[in-house]
Amino acid sequence: MAEITASLVKELRERTGAGMMECKKALVEANGDIELAIDNMRKSGQAKAAKKAGRVAAEGVILARIGAGFGVLVEMNCETDFVAKDAGFLGLANEVADFALANKGTTIETLAAQFEEKRAALVAKIGENMNIRRVQYLDGQVIAQYLHGAKIGVLVAGEGSDEELKKVAMHVAASRPEFVNPEDVSAEVVEHERQIQIDIAINSGKPKEIAEKMVEGRMKKFTGEVSLTGQAFVMDPSQSVGDYLKSVNTKVTNFIRLEVGEGIEKVEEDFAAEVAKITGGNA
């Protein structure tokens, strides 16, 4: 039996909106597998569509560079927001981004080796760990970029207006699409969601045959919600991104989105515990 920690229960609550006891029970039944717990809770009606896992806890910056026919995003992490704004840290991060631009296709391993000496020296000077975490390239006829406070970086590749593609990049930053078009959603993802929706319908009392017919309509909505062109455009929710792109004669071929610290869980202590540690328990 996997250990059901308080942080795991907290994450499940944040992602489903369900109560603490329901979340703990679901995790116990799923042996600590949070994704399985979410699926089971959705099937039983305890949770609606769960929020995507995207715990942003680590600090740092996302930097973007655009070259001839390609763009690159680089993520560099540190431990605190204070250091993320430090001139030395930002200087090194910009050096890394410039190197990635000048050496298209470079790997994260190459970047780490190239800048290890400077990184180690900066760690010794500042007294805080830091690392180059990710580098991602995107090829395209036209590349647009959008950075949201150096915490979220988006590159959009396409054909047509750079200005319009930048608006789409802003949409990607806000709405987190996973695919470009509804038809790009993989069969595996569609089937996984279909089975969940069928179980939800059956658990609500619908016969299996009727449940399966009901779900087909829901699947079209689902693929639209997770794809860029199927989503409502944040700058004009009355139309989809796809319809907007057609109206401005612009096409999106691909995109990438990085957010600082995605998937990294930062250990947090409550205020009382922190005070106790500082005072040696003599608060």
From Swiss-Prot:
Associates with the EF-Tu.GDP complex and induces the exchange of GDP to GTP. It remains bound to the aminoacyl-tRNA.EF-Tu.GTP complex up to the GTP hydrolysis stage on the ribosome. One of its GO terms (cellular component) is cytoplasm. The keyword Transcription regulation does not apply. Keywords: Cytoplasm, Elongation factor, Protein biosynthesis. Signal peptide: none annotated. It comes from the Bacteria. It is found in: Cytoplasm. It comes from Actinobacillus pleuropneumoniae serotype 3 (strain JL03). SUPFAM superfamilies: Elongation factor Ts (EF-Ts), dimerisation domain (SSF54713), UBA-like (SSF46934). Residues 80-83 are annotated as: Involved in Mg(2+) ion dislocation from EF-Tu. One of its GO terms (molecular function) is translation elongation factor activity. CDD domains: UBA_EF-Ts. PANTHER family: ELONGATION FACTOR TS (PTHR11741), ELONGATION FACTOR TS, MITOCHONDRIAL (PTHR11741:SF0). This is Elongation factor Ts.
